[in-house]
Amino acid sequence: MVENPIVKKYMHESSEKISSASKAQKLNIQAEIIYPDIHQTFWARVIGLGYPTPEPPGFRWCTERLKINPMNKFVEECIKTNGEIIILLGVRKAESAARSRSISEKEIAGYLLNPHNNINNAYVYNPLTEIENSLVWEYLLKDNGISPWGTSMKQLFSLYQGEDLSEEQSVLGEIDEKKIPITGNSRFGCWCCTLVKEDKSLQSFINK
């Protein structure tokens, strides 16, 4: 696969802890990790079939094959079992002007749920659209940065910051005293991405 290995490790550990905590507390919650069909993976297309790698501005076949299609397939399977589904997304308008436009275009005044663009009986709920980045991190880092299922939100914040917060920096202290604004604006992409000239998040991991 092509995910950043450090981020992948964190997400797999989090997924296992969510499922374990849910089982222990007898909650009907299960974390699922979705994969693309083996024939649609990046290396199968590029090395196996000779596909040219994605390049800007518009040649971006990877997102649909590696992310969108597998998720849509999973959603459709859930609908077959349950009749309908609500998809929660963590998108925010403050991420970028393009993201803000995209969210606004899909919003329906007076409704919390928006119909999915392509899938019947699927609805999208975006609970964080108006919330600032610093408030998201403030919430995640409360309770000493430990999530209800036992993962470290400080570690997650460290990944987004590109620095180790375990030694000299007290993130929770900064939040409580309002001394330093929380940023954590990094974005993680595929380590082999050919759409960007420089992968800053990957470089920060190398520097560490």
Region locations from a protein language model:
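Nucleotide-activated chemistry modules centered on ATP-dependent adenylation/adenylyltransferase
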Residues: 1-208
